[in-house]
Amino acid sequence: MTPEERNTAIYHKMEAEQDSYRDWLLTLPPDEILQHAYEYAVRQDILFAIEDLELQPEQCRVLMKSPCPVADVLRNFEKLELGYMETIRDCIEGRADKLLQPEKEVR
């Protein structure tokens, strides 16, 4: 199997896993679906990222061994300290400061 074929295979495996997750979500009541919205979005981002990656053959091999590579990556991602909320707060403050600019210029 060529490296490109390996990457395509892991992508398709992860895509199938995400499709199954989505199908499961759609069986839930709307309020429960909303409780999983963040997880679904991150899982989609994982799928988008894997689409552009060129993993090494051994990386593809070990990911293919997992019954649920998307869930595995998600668990790893959730353990990281990303400063997500700090970024959100910075964006709020930045937007407020930008909206204040015209008021400051008038003074």
Model region roles, listed by residue range:
Residues 1-107:
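Acidic interaction surfaces
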